[in-house]
Amino acid sequence: RVMDDEDRKIIAYHEAGHAIVQAFVDDGLLPIHKVTIIPRGQSLGSTMFTPKKDILNHSKKRVLNQICCAMGGRAAEEIEIGDVTSGAAGDIRMATNIARSMVCDWGMSDLGMISFGDKQDQVFLGKELSRAQNYSEETAQKIDLAIKNLIDEQFDRAKSILEENISALHVSAEALLEHETIEGKHVH
């Protein structure tokens, strides 16, 4: 794929957004390994982490931080170019899956400690895991709203972090444009 300067800039800010937010919210267990704007597979760039240990239990704080980091790319695009791109599709999917688990499986929302919908484990012919809907349409709407609220709150949090650390965002994006890949220790 051939990327023009505008695409490179958008991708650099997108990845820098993830990196700055992660550097800000990290509790020391998921430091940034490296950030790159070199395309690989379906991804136009990536921010890679090196876990300090296997994380077996996910705290609410940590999963909110994951959603916040996922939203950092989209928030950086909005701040820098005043628009958003389709580049955040995978981030949005991941954030939605985490938020859905928080609401439906882990009792980490205002809906309380209730499990909504049994996951169907029969995966065949390339179909994804599905959820049996054993609740009313009204409850489904509450679940959707709770998921949306979790993601919206973390997007706003990511945007605030980036606005408060705008010079770090610019420095990291410029470093990515110049070097294409930067080590995590250079993100600050």
Language-model-derived ranges and their functions:
Residues R8-Y13, A19-H188:
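Soluble catalytic regions of large protease machineries
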Residues R1-D5:
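P-loop NTPase nucleotide-binding/switch module
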